[in-house]
Design a protein with these regions (language model features):
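Peripheral, non-transmembrane regulatory/ligand-interaction domains of membrane transport proteins
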Residues: 1-108
Length: 108
């Protein structure tokens, strides 16, 4: 799922299209969504895929004017009998004009 936001007069507004200055949040994106965003913003799709790989470690990586900040974020799973805590990767990709955030799940 892709959500696009733009700040206007101090308010965060949801948008239909990617535009300069927008924040693009990708939650469990499929390959088509990854391809669309990466093609439009000229971002290497591997940076997005790294944010979806549960085995990735936290790091900062720079490539062709784009910066990936990869951190582990906590998640809570409850199976009805017990509560489990773990971490999943959360990617922040900075381009010249946009911010892309990527995660396997919705994290509140």
């Amino acid at each position: 799922m892709i959500s696009i936001y733009l700040t206007d007069c101090g308010r965060l507004l949801e948008q239909d299209q990617i535009c300069p200055g927008a924040w693009i949040h990708m939650s469990a994106p499929n390959e088509k969504e990854i391809g669309r965003v990466c093609a439009q913003l000229h971002v290497d799709p591997d940076l997005v895929r790294a944010s979806l790989d549960e085995e990735e470690r936290s790091r900062i990586e720079q490539e062709n004017g784009t910066t990936l900040i990869l951190v582990d974020t906590p998640v809570v799973d409850n199976d009805g009998h017990a509560t489990y805590y773990s971490t999943i990767p959360f990617g922040i990709i900075l381009t010249g004009e946009n911010i892309i955030t990527v995660c396997l799940k919705d994290v509140a």
